Design a protein with these regions (language model features):
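Short Pro-Gly-centered beta-turn/loop motif in secreted/extracellular proteins
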Residues: 71-81, 87
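Extracellular beta-sheet/turn segments enriched in Thr/Pro/Gly and aliphatic residues
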Residues: 99-139, 145
């Protein structure tokens, strides 16, 4: 009887400790949009997906809601690549390095609204083979910080490719 009570107490204490432990996660959330290369009209992407690669291995696959919303949790201590895509759309990637996030960080929200566009015939968007943005933990200010120089260069290359795609679309319509 005494052994049963002790076992029950140990089980209860370990269960209580487990449920009250800090989550130590990043909460990724946002919306997916699509933009027309013809007229720049923007609307919610209704069939979008998010693939999450943890240390280069696929760990999460999420379909956005019909409002383009996605929301998921990822543990700290890893490098992630988030790949946003949709049917007949180009894919965009964002790299998150959460390896240096502090152990006492319990939960933090990371908001990304991502705009995708339809694939254009015979136009290669080579700039999208690499992540469009890279984030890493900055201990000085206590947040995930974007590498602005990298993002500027990637955005510049993508804008150049988008201009070519728009010209090709305009020529094809004539």
């Amino acid at each position: 009887m005494r052994a049963t009570i002790i076992t029950a107490i140990i089980f209860f204490i370990s269960l209580t400790g487990y449920t009250q432990a800090p989550t130590k996660v990043l909460n990724f959330k946002g919306r997916l949009f699509e933009i027309s290369l013809k007229n720049n009209a923007e609307k919610i992407l209704k069939t979008g997906t998010v693939k999450v690669f943890q240390d280069k291995s696929l760990c999460v696959f999420i379909e956005a809601t019909h409002f383009g919303v996605y929301d998921f949790l990822l543990p700290l201590g890893h490098r992630y690549t988030l790949e946003f895509s949709g049917e007949n759309m180009v894919s965009k990637k964002i790299e998150i390095d959460a390896r240096r996030c502090p152990e006492n960080l319990e939960k933090t929200a990371v908001d990304f609204d991502v705009v995708l566009f339809a694939k254009a015939a015979e136009i290669q968007f080579n700039s999208l083979n690499a992540p469009i943005a890279k984030y890493t933990w900055d201990p000085r200010i206590g947040i995930l910080l974007n590498d602005d120089d990298y993002s500027f260069d990637q955005t510049k290359a993508l804008k150049k490719e988008v201009r070519k795609a728009k010209k090709a679309i305009t020529l094809a319509e004539k």
